[in-house]
């Protein structure tokens, strides 16, 4: 049984979050949680929170055994970018893009 958890509008770029997502794809959830705990990236905390939510969803909604779960799919899509202005010299301004992403984790007992 597949169970899904999502974090939409996560305040990290999709490119940076994908580096972390690639580390745990296909792993058992216990091993994936250990990897995320010791990964020194901001995105690892965000991905770990979504993974824990997916595990809780599988346990509560589907009655799945946590020991049998593995990360079936994990993907990170781009969310909308917030445009901000940074003042520069001589009255100019640069545009800053504050990027967001949508993190999706699918756990399965197969």
UniProtKB/Swiss-Prot annotation:
Q: Which SUPFAM superfamilies match?
A: Ribosomal protein L22
Going by the UniProt record, its keywords in alphabetical order are: Ribonucleoprotein, Ribosomal protein, RNA-binding, rRNA-binding
Q: Which GO terms describe its molecular function?
A: rRNA binding; structural constituent of ribosome
Record carries keyword Disulfide bond: no
Q: Which GO terms describe its cellular component?
A: cytosolic large ribosomal subunit
Q: Which cysteines are joined by disulfide bonds?
A: none
Q: Which CDD domains match?
A: Ribosomal_L22
Domain of life of the native organism: Bacteria
Q: Can you supply a Gene Ontology BP term from the record?
A: translation
Task: Please report which protein family the annotation says this sequence is part of.
Answer: Belongs to the universal ribosomal protein uL22 family.
Q: In UniProt terms, what function does this protein have? A: This protein binds specifically to 23S rRNA; its binding is stimulated by other ribosomal proteins, e.g. L4, L17, and L20. It is important during the early stages of 50S assembly. It makes multiple contacts with different domains of the 23S rRNA in the assembled 50S subunit and ribosome.
Subunit-level organization? Part of the 50S ribosomal subunit.
Q: What is this protein called?
A: Large ribosomal subunit protein uL22
Q: Please report the organism this UniProt entry assigns to the protein.
A: Haemophilus ducreyi (strain 35000HP / ATCC 700724)
């Amino acid at each position: 049984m597949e169970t899904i958890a999502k974090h939409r509008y996560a305040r990290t770029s999709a490119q940076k979050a994908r580096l972390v997502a690639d580390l745990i794809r296909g792993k058992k959830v216990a091993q994936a949680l250990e990897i995320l705990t010791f990964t020194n990236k901001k995105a690892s905390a965000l991905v770990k929170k979504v993974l824990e939510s997916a595990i809780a969803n599988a346990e509560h909604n589907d009655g799945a055994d946590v020991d049998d779960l593995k990360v079936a799919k994990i993907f990170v899509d781009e969310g909308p970018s917030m445009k901000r202005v940074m003042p520069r010299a001589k009255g100019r301004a640069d545009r800053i893009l504050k990027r967001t992403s949508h993190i999706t984790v699918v756990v399965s007992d197969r």
